[in-house]
């Protein structure tokens, strides 16, 4: 993928408009409870400030009604936190689309919630042109919204004098390209989660590329059904058994594999107090719920991971939130941490597992995108990246 990158541009004295993803969780009082996304935006902002650029940053926050900016929609708490992290005050500019505000060289301002502007979500061309007129260089650093064609992620990139990827966006593109376009083999994908239906496209796409497709959670239960196993009262989608079988057949025809559990951890309920039993997969009873893979299966998965050249990880293999059902995900996480392979991981549950088992420093790249990460792996064109590609030659 060819896109211009911020690090390759001379931004000195230029007006730089950065679309970041500062959509952080807040409590009922509006206090920020987790600031990873704000921290992830700092390298691009600092790069521009250190070179005496005039820096404008905007982001969405939540799902405001266009044309309104209620108290819960404001980026004011973000401006305070950003200022603390940068060690300098960050002014919040409201009603900024028409311009009329001053920003000094070496100063950064935060432009109020971009989704409060009428036309943002529909990628309105007139709005995009007005925003493009505010800057000399447009920087997209919001990979988490790259799958959405909106005025600040797509339209502005068409009309700004220069359009480029920020530090974070560039790193995401590089890591995903490394994992998917010319990966070191064997290529192993781990896809966990509750439902095949939400991951069907990605499973089909990966089945055409990977050497091993490890499935976990409710997804694995549907594959077990397809292979003729009894799963008791486990979460599954019987109506998608044919699709699961087709994916296994596709893998087999390529000489690849979907390694299914030979033993499982079951209980009669999903709770912190549930009693866990380890049993062979052929002994699952009519009222059992499969909530994790067993130790033999975990060891097999760990061996597959140990021999991988590239690992793409999206989702746990068990209900790891409860310790008695965390063994499979824990062993898999440990295997990834000790692997020589390049690993890219993404998705909320995956990030929670990485945090729980303290392996963040051992993962090659942790993606900040949820839906964008999945759509990239599905092989879809992400509108925001496509817009940057279209401006590469300018």
UniProtKB/Swiss-Prot annotation:
What's the superkingdom here?
Bacteria
Task: Kindly report the protein's main subcellular placement as a broad class.
Answer: cytoplasm
Which Enzyme Commission number(s) are on file for it? 2.7.2.3
Protein's GO biological process: gluconeogenesis; glycolytic process
Q: Where does ATP bind?
A: 199, 321, 347-350
- Asked if Kinase is a keyword of the record, the answer is yes
GO MF term (any one):
phosphoglycerate kinase activity
GO CC, sorted alphabetically, is:
cytosol
- An example Pfam family from this entry, by short name, is PGK
The protein's UniProt keywords, in alphabetical order, are: ATP-binding, Cytoplasm, Glycolysis, Kinase, Nucleotide-binding, Transferase
| Residues where substrate binds | 21-23, 37, 60-63, 115, 148
Could you tell me what reaction this enzyme catalyses?
Answer: (2R)-3-phosphoglycerate + ATP = (2R)-3-phospho-glyceroyl phosphate + ADP
Q: Which cysteines are joined by disulfide bonds?
A: none
Q: What class of enzyme is it?
A: transferase
The pathway entry for this protein reads as: Carbohydrate degradation; glycolysis; pyruvate from D-glyceraldehyde 3-phosphate: step 2/5
Which InterPro entries does the entry mention? Phosphoglycerate_kinase (IPR001576), Phosphoglycerate_kinase_CS (IPR015911), Phosphoglycerate_kinase_N (IPR015824), Phosphoglycerate_kinase_sf (IPR036043)
Protein location: Cytoplasm
Protein family according to the UniProt entry: Belongs to the phosphoglycerate kinase family.
Indicate the quaternary assembly: Monomer.
The protein in question is named Phosphoglycerate kinase
